[in-house]
């Protein structure tokens, strides 16, 4: 009986913890989606941001798929994988019913244990943008820019 009471109390505590907003848990808040490129880390100048916005707008006009870029200083204490899922849940990228949105996430000051780069792809593009392709894009295209 004591074990059952303990498990019930633990389950209740976990349920209440997950119901708390991210800010109450000490997690980084998800910024509002205001543009295709959200640079909260100050990594891009205005010209770079405008150029990237243009490329993403053209891609969306041609394919219908929506790509957003989020640049933040850090996702600590949360790993980039969990943070990017919270972002895609909040932003609802892609077309409704198609789920073809993609998030490119960069957390420039994350420690290597939390990773700094992530591509989060909706189910509607996972056949075209596989995990292996995402990894290759991050390693071969995006990561080299951090070494410059």
Map each language-model feature to its residues.
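Bacterial N-terminal signal peptides
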Residues: 8-21
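Positively charged n-region of N-terminal signal peptides that target proteins for export
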Residues: 1-5
